[in-house]
């Protein structure tokens, strides 16, 4: 008796529609219910590859790399100027899991920006910050604050070189008062100089030198005096 194959069971029509709706590869613009728009590549129904996303309510745009539906890789985020309608660059650099991560530049205003390393959306690692008032900080960051070794150059060309903690001068450091020709070297605690020495430094070239030079003062055991003064501030092991 000949074998008769059973007829192939027809797939429900909803499965056919669902398969057609699945997004993979390059697609033209796809609109969300809230008005957002995405144009670019997809994988397994997620934004993946190169693409551009426009937020309608935020009036902002991201152009760059995507991975599994999140910004990941290199990309640029811009916001629309309410007066001109043009898009102004806010951040250009690397992303991971939808957050700034790696090396990138963030523009806080036309005259204030940061270029350097990021971690989980915060400035972390090495970076340089240009402030609107003309000050420049270059050095280490942690949790969006100066932490570690760094140099702050003020707009008047005075500068601090040394240790930082939580955005404040903390630990050993040097402050160059180039406008009056003096140098302070010592220990700082939460932005306040606690123990150190002040000497003349480049006084003849300073634009506003002090009226009289600092007299030279010496102690028999300067290292011992400094250590004794620092101990209450940092303890025995610092």
UniProtKB/Swiss-Prot annotation:
Family annotation (Gene3D superfamilies): Histone H3 K4-specific methyltransferase SET7/9 N-terminal domain
Main location: cytoplasm
Any one cellular-component term (Gene Ontology): acrosomal vesicle
Localization per Swiss-Prot or TrEMBL: Cytoplasmic vesicle, Secretory vesicle, Acrosome
Top-level division of the source organism's lineage: Eukaryota
Annotated keywords: Cytoplasmic vesicle, Repeat
MORN repeat start and end residues: 38-60, 62-84, 91-113, 114-136, 137-159, 160-182, 184-205
Keyword Ligase part of the UniProt annotation: no
PANTHER family the record matches: MORN REPEAT-CONTAINING PROTEIN 3
Record's function text: Assembles a suppression complex (suppresome) by tethering SIRT1 and MDM2 to regulate composite modifications of p53/TP53. Confers both deacetylation-mediated functional inactivation, by SIRT1, and ubiquitination-dependent degradation, by MDM2, of p53/TP53, promoting a proliferative and cell survival behaviors. May play a role in the regulation of spermatogenesis.
Protein name per its UniProtKB record: MORN repeat-containing protein 3
Phylogenetic placement of the source organism: Eukaryota, Metazoa, Chordata, Craniata, Vertebrata
């Amino acid at each position: 008796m000949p074998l008769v194959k059973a007829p192939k069971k027809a797939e429900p029509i909803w499965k056919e529609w669902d398969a057609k709706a699945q997004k993979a590869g390059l697609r033209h613009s796809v609109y969300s219910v809230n008005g957002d728009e995405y144009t670019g590549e997809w994988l397994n129904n997620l934004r993946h590859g190169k693409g551009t996303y426009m937020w309608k309510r935020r009036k902002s745009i991201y152009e760059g790399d995507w991975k599994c539906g999140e910004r990941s890789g290199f990309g640029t985020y811009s916001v629309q100027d309410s007066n001109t309608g043009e898009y102004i660059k806010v951040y250009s650099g690397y992303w991971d899991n939808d957050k700034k991560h790696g090396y990138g530049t963030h523009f806080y205003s036309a005259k204030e920006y940061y270029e350097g390393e990021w971690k989980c959306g915060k400035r972390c690692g090495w970076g340089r910050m240009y402030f609107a008032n003309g000050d420049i900080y270059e050095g280490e960051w942690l949790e969006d604050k100066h932490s570690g070794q760094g140099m702050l150059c003020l707009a008047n060309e005075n500068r601090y070189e040394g240790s930082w903690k939580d955005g404040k001068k903390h630990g050993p450091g040097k402050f160059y008062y180039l406008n009056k020709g003096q140098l302070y070297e010592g220990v700082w605690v939460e932005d306040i100089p606690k123990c150190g020495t002040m000497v003349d430094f480049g006084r003849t070239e300073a634009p506003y030198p002090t009226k009289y030079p600092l007299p030279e003062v010496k102690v028999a055991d300067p290292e011992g005096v400094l250590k004794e003064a620092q101990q209450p501030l940092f303890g025995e092991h610092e």
